Amino acid sequence: CSNLSTCVLGKLSQELHKLQTYPRTDVGAGTP
């Protein structure tokens, strides 16, 4: 990664999305 801040922010956002989709699988099933 060229920019550490951007890389970290990207990974953090992905992790947050995963964490948010896990407990709400029944609400939005199949939606990314």
Swiss-Prot record:
The modification Proline amide is found at P32. This is Calcitonin. One of its GO terms (cellular component) is extracellular region. Disulfide bonds join C1-C7. Belongs to the calcitonin family. Keywords: Amidation, Disulfide bond, Hormone, Secreted. InterPro entries: Calcitonin (IPR021118), Calcitonin/adrenomedullin (IPR021116), Calcitonin_CS (IPR018360), Calcitonin_peptide-like (IPR001693). SMART domains: CALCITONIN. It is found in: Secreted. The keyword Secreted applies. It comes from the Eukaryota. PROSITE patterns: CALCITONIN. GO terms for molecular function: hormone activity. The keyword ATP-binding does not apply. It holds the Pfam family Calc_CGRP_IAPP. Causes a rapid but short-lived drop in the level of calcium and phosphate in blood by promoting the incorporation of those ions in the bones. It comes from Anguilla japonica.
